[in-house]
Amino acid sequence: MQTDNTKSNTNKTAKQEWGSFVFVICIALLIRILIMEPFTVPTGSMKATILENDYIFSTKYSYGYSNYSLSFFDFIPLFKGRIFAREPERGDIVVFRPPHDMSVRYIKRLIGLPGDKIQLIDDVIYINDKKIERTEVGTYISEEGIKYLKFKETLPNGRTYFSYKLAPIYGVIYNDRYGNTDVFYVPEGKYFFLGDNRDQSNDSRVNLGFVPFENFIAKAQFIWFSTKITWWDNDIGVINLVLKLKPWIESVRLNRIFRNLYNTDV
């Protein structure tokens, strides 16, 4: 027979467990909103620095906070501009909301700062009329068997990274549009972005345009997980998800897990 004391202790334990659960959820949400947030990359515009289905960890505090960087509040106009703002640097890989479609997130490399003059001539970036260092260092063959030329580029602040261009047998149709551009004058408060996959990126050269600082969400830091195929799909049903689990596990890219996105030794 259960006494009143036993019932009281049971209720107290249940309340404590529920309180602990709520506390953990609140801490997790605060971390996601203010400190770090994971993202999945669905496209190849940053290939081969970032591949499709790479899972990225990014730091929310790197540039301070705006409506767009505060998860769950990005469509609520809490305030204008940024608070605790920190200036981004050339070469940063940034997650942001594109001005033309606020329902999605883009990830690109920051090339141009406010006040800069940017142009690409024969695939070489010119910043304020000075071309950056660009050296061909080899080739890259994608998982689809497509060949890219691999270049090491160095920005004026010393930041180095790799960019990729379709080999000549693929790239002829892209040369005029992507490799030779108009002159871009970056307005105050806005930034110029490029994808590392230079011939296959919707970036500031074409449809994206300049990105306001307010639209920045986070700075991408490292890859924490990566797969060749996507497992979860709302349209395929439970049975097909189960059948897809084994090939999804087999598609894990072990060599990309915990890869630093700013490491040029790989």
UniProtKB/Swiss-Prot annotation:
InterPro entries, alphabetized? LexA/Signal_pep-like_sf, Pept_S26A_signal_pept_1, Pept_S26A_signal_pept_1_CS, Pept_S26A_signal_pept_1_Lys-AS, Peptidase_S26
Q: What is its EC number?
A: 3.4.21.89
Q: Which residues lie on this side of the membrane: Cytoplasmic?
A: 1-20
Q: Which reaction does it catalyse?
A: Cleavage of hydrophobic, N-terminal signal or leader sequences from secreted and periplasmic proteins
Active-site residues, Swiss-Prot/TrEMBL: 45, 108
Q: Which Pfam families match?
A: Peptidase_S26
UniProt GO BP:
signal peptide processing
* An annotated GO cellular component: plasma membrane
> Where does the UniProt annotation locate this protein?
Cell inner membrane
* Keyword Cell membrane found: yes
What membrane topology does this protein have?
Single-pass type II membrane protein
Q: Which residues lie on this side of the membrane: Periplasmic?
A: 42-266
GO MF terms held by the record:
serine-type endopeptidase activity
Keyword Oxidoreductase present in the record's keywords: the answer is no
Enumerate the transmembrane spans. Answer: 21-41
Keywords from the named record: Cell inner membrane, Cell membrane, Hydrolase, Membrane, Transmembrane, Transmembrane helix
Per its UniProt record, what CDD domains does this chain match? S26_SPase_I (cd06530)
**Record family assignment:** Belongs to the peptidase S26 family.
* Protein name per UniProt: Signal peptidase I
Q: What is the species listed in this Swiss-Prot or TrEMBL entry?
A: Rickettsia massiliae (strain Mtu5)
Q: What is the lineage of its organism?
A: Bacteria, Pseudomonadati, Pseudomonadota, Alphaproteobacteria, Rickettsiales
